[in-house]
C-alpha cells in the first residue's frame, strides 16, 4: 500500500463512494475489497486532528447524495449503451454527469475550506452556463 497526500474533501469523497459501494455491490470478493478500503480510510479520517462529524454533517450528506445520484446515472447510461439506445433520455443522462460532477467538486471545495485543507482540487473547464 502507498499513502499519498490528498485534500480532506477528496478523502471524504472517497469514503462516501465506498459507503455507496457497500450498499449496492453484492459480489462477495468485491465487497471484501471495498470493506477493507473503507475501514482503512475511515480509520485514517478519524485519526486526523481535522476530524469532526458535527461540523461537516450536512456537507457529507450532500456529497453522499450527489455521489449516489452519479452512481444511478452511470448505471442508467450503461443500460442505454447495452440496448444501443442513444435517444433523448441517454443524452439527458450523459449531460447530467458533468453537472453532478460540478456539484460534487463544489461540495468538496466547501469541505476543504471548512477544514482548512492544505490541498485543494482545481477544475478548469469551459463554462457551459451563465
Regions found by a protein language model. Name each.
Residues 1-130:
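Extended, charge-rich alpha-helical interface modules
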Amino acid at each position: 500500500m502507498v499513502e499519498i497526500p490528498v485534500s480532506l474533501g477528496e478523502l471524504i469523497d472517497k469514503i462516501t463512494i465506498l459507503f455507496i459501494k457497500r450498499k449496492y455491490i453484492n459480489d462477495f470478493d468485491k465487497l471484501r475489497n471495498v470493506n477493507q478500503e473503507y475501514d482503512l480510510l475511515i480509520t485514517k479520517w478519524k485519526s486526523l486532528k481535522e476530524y469532526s462529524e458535527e461540523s461537516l454533517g450536512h456537507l457529507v450528506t450532500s456529497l453522499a447524495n450527489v455521489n449516489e445520484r452519479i452512481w444511478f446515472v452511470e448505471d442508467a447510461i450503461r443500460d442505454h449503451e447495452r440496448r444501443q439506445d442513444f435517444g433523448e433520455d441517454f443524452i439527458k443522462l450523459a449531460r447530467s454527469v458533468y453537472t453532478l460532477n460540478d456539484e460534487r467538486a463544489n461540495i468538496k471545495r466547501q469541505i476543504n475550506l471548512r477544514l482548512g485543507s492544505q490541498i485543494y482540487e482545481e477544475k478548469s473547464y469551459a463554462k457551459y452556463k451563465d
